[in-house]
């Protein structure tokens, strides 16, 4: 199955793309995709403190099981104070 991963903000500078397609096996989770993305883009910060993970427009946990055609958006945290 295939899912899509969208990059936002400064992530696009690291990945040099807006999104990628990822081929998964049935039963794989958000965390599996994040591990794949981290291996492909080692300079990309994907810790819970640096980004929010959204699947199909809903904030989710890393243990969520993915389905074909799911869309993951990785949203970087912006500022603080």
Tell me what each language-model feature is.
Residues 1-80:
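Ubiquitin-like/PB1-type beta-grasp interaction modules and other compact soluble beta-rich domains
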């Amino acid at each position: 199955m295939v899912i899509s991963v969208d990059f936002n903000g400064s992530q696009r500078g690291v990945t040099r793309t807006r999104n990628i397609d990822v081929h998964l096996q049935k039963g794989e989770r958000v965390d599996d995709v994040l591990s794949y993305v981290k291996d492909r883009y080692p300079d990309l910060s994907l810790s819970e403190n640096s980004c929010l993970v959204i699947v199909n427009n809903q904030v989710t946990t890393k243990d969520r099981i993915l389905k074909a055609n799911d869309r993951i958006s990785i949203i970087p945290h912006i500022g603080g104070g």
